[in-house]
């Protein structure tokens, strides 16, 4: 028995090349595949990130939102504040172009994402209330937002996004649908 662990294959390698897990190799690294991200296997994405809607306000037309007044409202609008920002791992590249889910409805991110908060437009979800769950990526009702949208917007890969999720974001690990 060898005292050494020898590997060459990560998720996509082991999905595409049998040589990655045959002699002399005795270990594989299936890291990203464990989150459901491996194009060769067409896995179900299992990572999700949630936050809470902590404030809702109606703002008049021409109000500006975010640092540097990055977004100007064209009409009177319902605007919400989400308790998550770039310190939690939301890419700044999602400012004024990304989306979240509230009650299963796609809501645009407006303005520049700040360190601790993200502002969203709630005009399509007038029933939204403070405390509602906001899906940053994952599934809600029959809707889904993929983490791939974040990596595409940032021009990077999934590993960068997953590793960039901040330390203050609580991790919950599930097995067979139940939290451990």
Segments from the language model and where they lie:
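Active-site anion/phosphate-binding pocket segments in diverse small-molecule metabolic enzymes
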Residues: 1-180
